[in-house]
Amino acid sequence: MYKRQVFILLVSLITIYIIKIQNIDRPSKRILYLYSLYWFISLFLSTLGLYDYKVPKFETLFCLCISCWALIGGFLLIKCPVKSVDLKQSGIQLSIRGFFKNKLFVGVLVVLTCYSLYLLYKFYTFMALGDLYQIRNLYFESGDLNIYGALFPNMNYWILKPFSFLCAGLFGFGVLYYRSKLLLLIFVMLFSLSSLGGGRLDYFRYLVIPLLLFGYCFYPKRFKVTLKKGFLILVMAAAMFFLLTIIGAGRRGYMEFDKESLDVGVEMTTENLMSYSYGPIVAFDYALNNNYLDKLGGYSYGTLTFNAFNGLLDIAFRMIGISYGTNFSDFVILKQDTWITLSRQNFDKNWNALFSWNFYFYLDFGIVGMIVLPFLFGFLIRKSIYWFYRYQNVSSMMLLSILFLSLILSVLDFNLSSIPIGILMIYLYMKSHNCKLK
């Protein structure tokens, strides 16, 4: 076991040194630091066997390290101007001002904010009648069984989530560099939608990670933690931990606001913060060693990683009466509806859904996929930074924030596989290039 820990420490130190000596722009370097630190901390924690979790095999850890290096290699392949952008003075200020005056966007935002508040009201109504665990199960049901109604699953997939991805970047940028009353509506909508499933990840996905991108990575100066900044970060962290504690207690059936509920919530939140850091790595190791590739019928050759576009082809062919076919539904059943145990002894660590984004890459092309696809993604995210520098408009900013979000959450899952997100990214790419500064 010590061999694994020494290996991860050695690789992480080499990686940080390689990043440090690169002559690249400050935001790019900070993004690489965040990605590398999160991955290698998670890999190291997975070797400790905390909370009775199994320890991944050395071969699995080695492949994951190579995958991390592949992304860094693709990222560094693109040459960006060694500069940054003053987000308070750049052309994006004019672009975002025009976007916030767009009547269609404002109208959709108002309607979806009202709808999200209605759903939040239903959430608290149901929470008063039952425990949060039951509510979460009903949140994922389809049709009339869904807690928010038969139309909600499609509304959530096609409209609410893509719009939330779009607004997350606006929120992170606007809170720090732009003042608008619409930011309050965006916050209310994102907070409400993040609460509906009784989960915790969406709070980080839509509210915390965008602030990390624009508050740290694109901070125009050397980042120093002053007393004021430290106090603000501490207050935000405490508020987030308290929120997660309340949710954790509710999922155990403790709905009262008392000491016992808080104790249970703190215990569950602490364990979950740890397990969600390395659990997906242990789950990925489990999948490698339990023939998940054979269960899916062999390699998928890109249909999982690029399901956002493969699904569009499937829809297009079906419209003309041709059965194109896709195995993504079988993959979802294998990934989300099949529960596994990651415990070494007690068999109480039930797990599903989160296997890291390498799960997609491996099932598509095997070990080669774990090298080539992260390399391409690293290439893409650095390219998106270049587009952001060059065009300085709201569309390039949103595209960058979506890719950054997927990068940071790569330890957990792959966030770019849904069809609506694929459509949104294509639209933002085209819009950013059409609106470039003259």
Regions found by a protein language model. Name each.
Residues 6-13, 107-120, 156-168, 359-382:
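Hydrophobic alpha-helical transmembrane segments
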Residues 82-255, 339-342:
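Membrane-embedded catalytic interface detector for glycan/lipid assembly enzymes
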Residues 350-438:
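Hydrophobic alpha-helical segments
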Residues 3-102, 190, 206-250, 416-433:
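N-terminal "leader" segments that precede or initiate the main folded domain
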Residues 12-15, 165-171, 185-193, 355-359, ...:
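Hydrophobic, membrane-inserted alpha-helices
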Residues 24-38, 179-185, 387-400:
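Membrane-interfacial loop-to-transmembrane alpha-helix junctions, especially the N-terminal start
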Residues 51-55, 195-203, 408-416:
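Membrane-interface helix caps and helix-loop-helix hairpins in membrane proteins
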Residues 139-151, 244-377:
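Small-residue-enriched transmembrane helix-hairpin modules in multi-pass membrane proteins
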